[in-house]
Design a protein with these regions (language model features):
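Select transmembrane alpha-helical segments in multipass membrane proteins
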Residues: 1-7, 36-37, 99-119, 156-159, ...
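Helix-loop-helix module between adjacent transmembrane segments
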Residues: 1-46, 215-224
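Helix-loop-helix hairpins and the membrane-proximal interhelical loops
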Residues: 52-113
Length: 338
């Protein structure tokens, strides 16, 4: 239920808002036009089913990451002399060593955790849904891949955004009382526009901001396909795969997507945080209840790896009933090797 309400309803409008803002800033595209076109294109994909989602999202994900990292490298090269100061500022601010920001350390930590979890989805349980269809001989393999994805998302992609913003100097910092401690971005709303205007200030012309707008569309498009996959999976579980339920979540999801251009940024963030919190609380409780079993599965994986074997999983060894038969082949392989 939390998976349906989070990715399917409360968390998706914010991303459409980001697309509309960067497209308006780069090309002057009206918000309603951006929202309508994005919703229609996404609707074509999600109505094509889960297989179409997988075939489209993989190449787009690779392309968008490459584009974004190339832009970041360009900013870093052009501002190489500023990089030591940028990283010093990051660490000083993080640990309250920068006098200007010391008073808002708690707020900084709070916002960092909220936005970080929103980005990498750590602890929400959504990663398990996304990787469940993969074919692997041992669940620990896929678990390690998911850990790597969180690392890449947080320490590579999110850090790239930080480098662009801090190197360009285009940002505001708000104090605990709402006043601006640092005001270098004027009235520009916080978020993706800091990155876009930061790029425009580093590279000549507005081409980099336009490239970012296109990359953002790709980022959000693939992300929303993932959101829909999670929501549909939850709906299928609740209603045993009934077609009416699937079409209902499609309609609700696409309506929520379009609502992003009709609502204010603050309200969308509040809705998104609610969805993230809803998923995380339920999932973290489940993680704590299953931690002993997970540890045993990881030990099994490591023991087989140390022997030079390709780890195979037998759910019966851990008291797990495999009603689908998904692990039968690997369980048999493990028994034959014993």
């Amino acid at each position: 239920l939390a998976t349906v309400l989070g990715p399917g309803v409360t968390m998706c409008g914010l991303h459409t808002n980001s697309i509309a803002s960067v497209m308006d800033n780069a090309f002057g595209t009206p918000w309603l036009v951006s929202g309508a076109l994005f919703t229609i294109c996404l609707g074509i994909v999600v109505c094509g089913g889960i297989k179409r989602i997988g075939s489209i999202s993989e190449p787009m994900s690779i392309a968008m990451c490459i584009i974004y990292l190339i832009l970041t490298i360009g900013v870093a090269v052009l501002n190489a002399s500023a990089l030591p100061g940028v990283f010093a500022l990051i660490f000083k601010s993080a640990f309250g060593l920068e006098p200007v920001f010391a008073g808002i350390m708690g707020s900084t930590l709070n916002w960092g955790i909220k936005r970080g979890v929103y980005s990498n989805e750590a602890g929400q349980g959504s990663g398990a849904i996304m990787c469940a269809p993969t074919e692997t001989s041992h669940p620990a393999k896929q678990g390690l891949v998911q850990v790597l994805s969180i690392f890449v998302d947080t320490l590579v992609i999110c850090s790239a955004s930080a480098v662009i913003i801090l190197c360009s100097g285009f940002y505001n910092v708000q104090g605990a009382d709402g006043s601006l401690i640092v005001s270098q971005a004027g009235d520009t709303p916080y978020g993706i526009l800091y990155v876009q205007e930061g790029l425009n200030s580093v590279f000549p012309g507005n081409w980099s901001g336009m490239v970012l707008a296109i990359a953002t569309v790709l980022f959000v498009f693939t992300g929303m396909m993932g959101y829909y996959y999670q929501a549909e999976s939850g709906m299928n579980y609740l209603f045993k795969g009934k077609r009416g339920a699937v079409w209902a979540i499609r309609a609700i999801f696409l309506t929520s997507i379009f609502s992003g251009v009709l609502m204010e940024n603050e309200g969308l963030w509040a809705l998104g945080d609610t969805g993230v919190g809803l998923m995380a609380w339920f999932n973290i409780i489940a993680i704590l209840l299953m931690c002993k079993q997970v540890k045993a599965i990881m030990v099994d994986f490591e023991e087989q790896s140390k022997k030079g074997l390709d780890p195979c999983f037998d759910p019966s060894e851990f008291g797990i009933e495999d009603t689908t038969g998904a692990w039968d082949r690997y369980a048999e392989q493990k028994k034959q090797r014993s």
